Amino acid sequence: MNRRTFLGITACATTAACAQGVREQNAPLSIRIRSEHQGRRVPRNFIGLSYELAQLSEPAFFSAQHNDLVALFRRLSPSGVLRLGGNTSEFCWFQATPETPAPKLHTPPGDLGQNWMPHRLFAIQPAAIDALAGFLDATGWTLIYGLNFGNSTPARAAAEAAYVQQKLGSRLNFFQIGNEPDLYQKASNGTRPPGWGFDDYVREWLAFADAVSARVPEARFGGPDTAASSDWVIRFGNEVAPKLGKRLVALSGHYYAEGPPNDPRVTTERLLAGNPAVAESARAIVRAADAHNLIYRMTEGNSCYRGGKPGMSDAFAASLWAADYLMTLASLGCAGINLHGGDSRFLSAGLGDHNPGLEVAGNNKPSAANGFYTPIATERGQVAGARPVYYGMLLAQEFAGATLLGLEPAQSGSLGAYGAERSGTVLLALVNKASFGDRDIHIMSDRSFSRATLWRLTGPGLDATTGVEFGRSAVSSEGAWNPRSEPLPVRNGALQIAVPAASAVLVFLS
């Protein structure tokens, strides 16, 4: 298992199918909805986005005046969660006044060409936090704010947290302290010396949390925000929760399905096949969170680490991956997910100014704008727009606030199936990840329905970077989206649905 697969929850779950490949012949399938088998309620703020904290070094980005970005956030979710963190958060500093001195830039030992961390500092001024407050008010979203742990001090973190809490108030969900600390001792990171480990992390983390709490008694925290170590997440809950009590509200970790982009083994076929071996880790984390009355949130991830792979992360394949992955996490009890993205300048800075996806792009380098995996294209000087992965998130958003229902069977090759009920309407998502082989689905239920409609998630091909639609409608740069329903005949309480290869449907039953 590589460092990005510990939360590889694209595996089968009780209400989802386990991908066994992406090439499957047409095989009729019967699915029964078990409405008496109710699961968890999907939180209304399940959907989220993750950005580099250094994006705040340009205060106009997250502001109420960034109209197209506000519109696309609101379209994606009326109550989503923005997470600010990433590698750049370890090199950001709060410039409270013009006289506030910058911290010393940490330079790790060894060859900087092999180091994947930023090599410069990013100043965050009060004006950026003020603008961020307006952005959150305009979108209806709340925030997870990442504090610099790798190259800062408890006193600096406390001063920054005090201003953030004062300005954001109830819009602030919790603070995270540090980003991917399980990688600190590696040469690619270099934030801590070799041999530094979990016990060192907890001791230092608690010093930061106590300093923040002394300045901000109402502060709440989440962690450990690891890259790959599920055991760190569980140990963090077990060891830190008793010390912090109600101040700790969430366990968090990251997940990237594939990577790096210049590895020839990273393919669309492998992305959509999923990784069933890691579902057990996800369930273990949820159990640990439940034991301490915490939530578990996947706070940073996407289809392929180190910026994404062209022709996969920026293509329709990512739409299907996102829809299936988000619904799988929901079915396993995850309280939310934040897919990473943003301006290519800050994504590249967060990788030590490396961008391996460009090697794959070759002469097609303009397609790298914003990073290949970003849900929303926001390159400087350009109008924002919804990328393919955004549409998969849009499908999953329909389940926000719904109560999950059991489905039988639990497995069906490359077809992912998810059911839920919201306000008397049953939702059924079917994601056909096969590259060829349409599926004919016979739907039955233990309750009667008289009306059925559906929206289809479609694209010209798995590698298509344009032409993606959900409900026969694209999302405009102004956030306009007008889905059109397709009626389905209901006969004796059952219905037939055709799900073409490389597509998904969302069915509404009432």
What are these regions (language model features)?
Residues 236-250, 254-256, 274-291:
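Catalytic-core regions of glycoside hydrolase
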Residues 271-275, 312-319, 379-386:
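Hydrophobic alpha-helical scaffolding
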